[in-house]
Amino acid sequence: MADPHSILKKVFGYDSFRPGQEDIVRRLLAGQDVLAVMPTGAGKSICYQVPALLLPGITIVVSPLVSLMKDQVGALVQAGVAAAFLNNSLTDNQKALMLRRAREGWYKIIYVAPERLEMPGFQHFAQEKLISMVTVDEAHCISQWGQDFRPSYLRIKEFVDSLPNRPVVGAFTATATARVRDDIRSHLELHQPYEVTTGFDRPNLYFETRRALPSQKPKELLDLVLREGDNAGIVYCSTTKQVDETARLLQSRGIRAAAYHAKLDAEVRRKNQDDFLYDRVQIMVATNAFGMGIDKPNVRFVIHYNMPKDLESYYQEAGRAGRDGLPSRCILLYSGTDVRTIRFFIDKEMEADNGLPADVKAEAARKAEERLRYMTFYSTTQKCLRRFMLNYFGEAAPEKCGNCSCCLFAEQNAQEVEQRAAAAKQRAAANSRRLSARRAAVGGDLSEVDEKLLAALYALRKRLAAKQNVPAYMVFSDATLREMVQSKPLSMDEFLNITGVGEKKAARYGMAFLRAIEDMVGSRE
């Protein structure tokens, strides 16, 4: 029988687990429930995907958004894993085919929205098959204290209880205060769970706050975006009107930008999201409807054009930068107008006819105001931004991180800020105590020859991805390509030693990359 380490290497291409991952995997395999709080980019999905491939039955992953399911399943299929998703983006015929195949044992991992668990057809399927594990992703959605409360998450427990044999349950989230963790544990009725918080820190992320009047924000944004060159980025706005205006502003300057918000036609949203994932668009301008669970690893910057409603939302959205561990920037533009806009939405939610009792809505509004207060403190503090956030999530941190605007740029003018920010990005890759030596190496500077090789590998990846009709990062991540440049493998055995290269991907793409490397650097013999 395979063990977790062999699955990790053969399927996902990693030599070792990251901190906290192996303990979670082994607890789930032993049948113990898990509650794990891990920052975006820390590898939550590995924690349930590895045991899913080792457990005898099917794993059901409850996920809140179609985009997350599509990303995760696409990446799994590229790695050779039998996975599928079931949601309303499929036609009725596609849903029926997927369920029939699931009954026939085609899949080891199935992603569903929480509402799907209540549907008779899916319930009948789950009664017939062995469900070994139920994974609750974005588990903070179960809590009214959480920033993304979804009432349908409260019914996950009923589904678990209805199964003939109770599966092991794993709950995962990137951001959860102590109160939210209490709600997750209680509402899912986890059985003596193994609880772990691997730490919220993302050392490769640089944080910055800038106060800017609404009239100043367009210029600030353009300056920031133009300095990023061709890097992929996300710009978050608080309203759909602001999204449309900001996307048009960037487009008017020749920047490949697209908009994403709930008022757009579903087909337009899908096209714009795919354009971003497939690198046809450089920048996505979006409300927070975009990105929960988006797994695009090479987002190099996230700019919040408006202050978010709370630190949970901010850290989750900012955390979509640098998921591959390479240096990336998270910048917040804020003004007093932002606070008034958020309060308007809080009041609107209070007035909404959503069937909730008045006292429940009043309590939700009070909690929202409390979270907004901390968000405002973060935006205006002169102390270390990283420490402020980590302390908010209950984690100790040094007085100064050395990689945020408050630490690095106090009393400096804007030009000095940008110069030192560039230097800080380089230091983050080389010196971060959380990044391994290997990951630090692939984030460093390259020689002119290596830059040409990297460009050739990017071009090859783009061609191969187009043939497979998948986003380029699903072939190999930027970090994996940079390690290829550093290591210059010339044999399949050497290629399989590259982080992120599993057996299926090596079989599918290995010879093409080996030929490209040999063409550029020649034989070492």
Task: Place the predicted regions along the sequence by residue.
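Short alpha-helical "packing" element that flanks the helix-turn-helix/winged-helix DNA-binding module
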Residues: 21-24, 375, 481
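Accessory DNA-binding and partner-docking regions appended to nucleic-acid-acting proteins
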Residues: 1-4, 340-341, 346-361, 367-373, ...
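Conserved catalytic helix of short-chain dehydrogenase/reductases
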Residues: 67
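Helicase motor core with emphasis on the C-terminal RecA-like subdomain
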Residues: 2-11, 15-19, 23-45, 52-55, ...
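Short alpha-helical segment immediately N-terminal to, or the first helix within
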Residues: 27, 304, 378, 483-484
